[in-house]
Amino acid sequence: MRTQVGIIGAGPAGLLLSHLLYLQGIESIIIENRTREEIEGTIRAGVLEQGTVDLMNQMGVGARMMKEGHFHEGFELRFNGRGHRINVHELTGGKYVTVYAQHEVIKDLVAARLQTGGQIHFNVGDVSLHDVDTSSPKIRFRPNKDGELQEIECDFIAGCDGFRGPSRPAIPQSVRKEYQKVYPFSWLGILVEAPPSAHELIYANHERGFALVSTRSPQIQRLYLQVDAQDHIDNWSDDRIWSELHARLETRDGFKLLEGPIFQKGIVSMRSFVCDPMQHGRLFLAGDAAHIVPPTGAKGLNLAAADVQVLARGLEAYYKAGKMEILNRCTEICLRRIWKAERFSWFMTTMLHRDQGHTPFERGIQLAELDYVTSSRAASTSLAENYIGLPMEF
């Protein structure tokens, strides 16, 4: 097989990139180690920045998102038994965030690629990258996990295959520098058959730990609890989960948490990670292959969307004008924004979670930070600007 851009991974990064390239007349082939049913059926939350929503609409894949998504003009920070609303819409000149699950984004993008003749090979195995530092890099894989080995010859490879995929290790260790922080806590997330308990997201800092109230649909709400990093889901009965949520979300004004049957629950680890550089030869990384953020800042999918916008623009300049300038600067352009998103995600995580190693002094600093960002317009504006998504800067 021969194509212009070989894309490894059919997550948000790979699918967005493929469709952006299609709109510019650039060919691509996507390979993915999971089945279509797996990637479309893995339920994951999604809080989309204004820029990501705008991108999907500009690409012509945003119709269902605009119909079914929940548009939030703010969010609440809750501590010391009181809620404090951050009016993002007002503080950012009319912008908002959209709650639309990641797997729904994937469904829309897969449908768009297939409807326009895009090639996606699902359920592949033994993926490997070759000759990435030449002008003709190659991807090898086995169809249906154990079929006969096939090869895609490309001009460029986009590694959109997540944190554990084969793309990042294809950058030599002598070239690659990795930055990482692993947090001493995790999130226990549940999906509940109950209407949302609030119209906007609630981020709660409590003596017992962090809690988050989110939404999935008018009939389903998503809730999270901070738990120990070594904890196991078997330790958490439904009754224990509800008891802890009620305790951490309690307010002096009688907030009511709506209960219902829990039909999904699991524990998600928390880490921050950055790979530098995000490119080597004709290989470019995007999304979780290049960086991970804790979910507190809701930046994962949005960073992937930003990465592929830069890469798509660089590839467009190469194929239409023979220019390599943007491609050569991809790492520089992307990492400038990524590090700011990493900072914001770390800031939100450390401000909202209880670390068992904290002294009373550090607890006092944490509460002072919360008080400051909710009482100072300047601090609230900074928070809102980061939450809504920083601009792309080339």
UniProtKB/Swiss-Prot annotation:
Protein's name according to its UniProt entry: 4-hydroxybenzoate 3-monooxygenase (NAD(P)H)
Species lineage: Bacteria, Bacillati, Bacillota, Bacilli, Bacillales
Q: Where does substrate bind?
A: Y203, S214, T215, R216, Y224, P295
Cofactor(s) needed, names only, are: FAD
Query: Which InterPro entries does its entry note?
Result: FAD-bd, FAD/NAD-bd_sf, HB_mOase, RIFMO-like
Q: Which GO terms describe its molecular function?
A: 4-hydroxybenzoate 3-monooxygenase (NADH) activity; 4-hydroxybenzoate 3-monooxygenase (NADPH) activity; 4-hydroxybenzoate 3-monooxygenase [NAD(P)H] activity; 4-hydroxybenzoate 3-monooxygenase activity; FAD binding; flavin adenine dinucleotide binding
What is catalysed by this protein? 4-hydroxybenzoate + NADH + O2 + H(+) = 3,4-dihydroxybenzoate + NAD(+) + H2O; 4-hydroxybenzoate + NADPH + O2 + H(+) = 3,4-dihydroxybenzoate + NADP(+) + H2O
Q: Where is this site: Important for catalytic activity?
A: Y203, Y387
Q: In Gene Ontology terms, what is a biological process of this protein?
A: benzoate catabolic process
Would you identify the family this protein belongs to, as annotated?
Answer: Belongs to the aromatic-ring hydroxylase family.
Read off the Pfam families from this record. Answer: FAD_binding_3 (PF01494)
Stated role: Involved in the degradation of 4-hydroxybenzoate (4HB) via the protocatechuate (PCA) 2,3-cleavage pathway. Catalyzes the conversion of 4HB into 2-hydroxypenta-2,4-dienoate (HPD). It is highly specific for 4-hydroxybenzoate, and is able to utilize both NADH and NADPH as electron donors at approximately equal rates.
Q: Does the keyword Flavoprotein apply?
A: yes
EC nos: 1.14.13.33
Kindly list the positions annotated as binding FAD: E32, T42, I43, R44, A45, G46, V47, Q102, D288, L301, N302
Record flagged with keyword Kinase = no
Cofactor binding comment, as recorded: Binds 1 FAD per subunit.
Whose protein is this, by species?
Paenibacillus sp
Which principal EC class is assigned to this enzyme? oxidoreductase
Record key words, sorted: Aromatic hydrocarbons catabolism, FAD, Flavoprotein, Monooxygenase, NAD, NADP, Oxidoreductase
